[in-house]
Amino acid sequence: MSILSEFKEFAVKGNVIDLAVGVIIGAAFGKIVDSIVADIIMPVVGLVFGKLDFSNLYVVLGTVPAGVANNLADLKKAGVPVLAYGNFITIAVNFVILAFIIFMMVKQINKLRKTHAEAPAAPVAPPEDIALLREIRDSLKRP
């Protein structure tokens, strides 16, 4: 089998196509979650904690050279070691929200699967010869 035909067989398998669809939907879903976090959740969190933008929260771990502005971008550009925990907070909130949304989706999908579960199939009638043998057996058992 040639490499091209093997690749074609691999690429058109159902699992690969399902994976591709999942990746595309996941990318679009990521944008939705980013919007939910940035436009809905973070303003509420900012209202509670008094700050909307957590990305500029940091702790300076070294000495700041003279003439360097005391903001995260300039400190990083100057090579000052900083512990930028604000970006981590934002990413952690994104993760928790994404995990919760995926959990709720999976829960609903499982619920739908249970309600739409196929009824057990009716038992298949035994072949005619088996049915005939059973009748003979039953007639022989009678007194």
From Swiss-Prot:
Signal sequence bounds: none
Gene Ontology cellular-component annotations: plasma membrane
Gene Ontology molecular function terms on file: mechanosensitive monoatomic ion channel activity
Pfam family for this entry, one: MscL
Keyword Transmembrane among record annotations: yes
TM segment ranges: 21-41, 44-64, 86-106
SUPFAM superfamilies per record: Gated mechanosensitive channel
Location(s), subcellular: Cell inner membrane
PROSITE patterns in the cross-refs: MSCL
Membrane topology listed for this record: Multi-pass membrane protein
S-S pairs: none
Record-linked InterPro entries: Mechanosensitive_channel_CS, MS_channel, MSC/AndL, MscL_channel
Record's keyword terms, sorted: Cell inner membrane, Cell membrane, Ion channel, Ion transport, Membrane, Transmembrane, Transmembrane helix, Transport
The keyword Ion transport is assigned to this record: yes
Subunit structure, as described in the record: Homopentamer.
Family note: Belongs to the MscL family.
Function: Channel that opens in response to stretch forces in the membrane lipid bilayer. May participate in the regulation of osmotic pressure changes within the cell.
PANTHER family according to UniProt: LARGE-CONDUCTANCE MECHANOSENSITIVE CHANNEL (PTHR30266:SF2), MECHANOSENSITIVE CHANNEL MSCL (PTHR30266)
Protein name: Large-conductance mechanosensitive channel
Gene: mscL
